[in-house]
Amino acid sequence: MSSPVRTPPPERLEPNPGMSYAVMEIAIIAAVITAVALVLVCLLFLMLRYLYRHKGTYYTNEAKGTEFAESADAALQSDPALQDAGDTSKKEYFI
């Protein structure tokens, strides 16, 4: 009598469960690093654009003729925009 032929069990087609978690973690880490790098590049672009567009735009609002005055008080007393209709003997200085 011949012995029955045994067939080997079918191979599992499922991937190794430990390996799938490792691949998934690598994909998540790569996505986060890519997102952070993209945000940093965008911020760098916006900062360089801002610095380029606002280069040398510094405007002062000083009274005209202040460079020829003896002191700051003398320059401000002659400025018509700062002339007060009230009494000039009372002066208040805010520091």
UniProtKB/Swiss-Prot annotation:
Residue ranges of the TM segments? 26-46
Q: Give the GO cellular component terms, alphabetically.
A: cortical cytoskeleton; membrane; plasma membrane
Keyword Transferase appears in the UniProt entry:
no
Query: Where is the protein found, in the record's own terms?
Result: Cell membrane
| Statement: the UniProt record of this protein carries the keyword Transmembrane helix | yes
**Stretches in topological domain Extracellular:** 1-25
Fetch the InterPro entries from UniProt. Glycophorin-C, Neurexin-like
Q: Topological domains (Cytoplasmic): residue ranges? A: 47-95
- Membrane topology value: Single-pass type III membrane protein
Q: Supply the PANTHER family for this chain.
A: GLYCOPHORIN-C
| Entry's family note | Belongs to the glycophorin-C family.
Q: What is this protein called?
A: Glycophorin-C
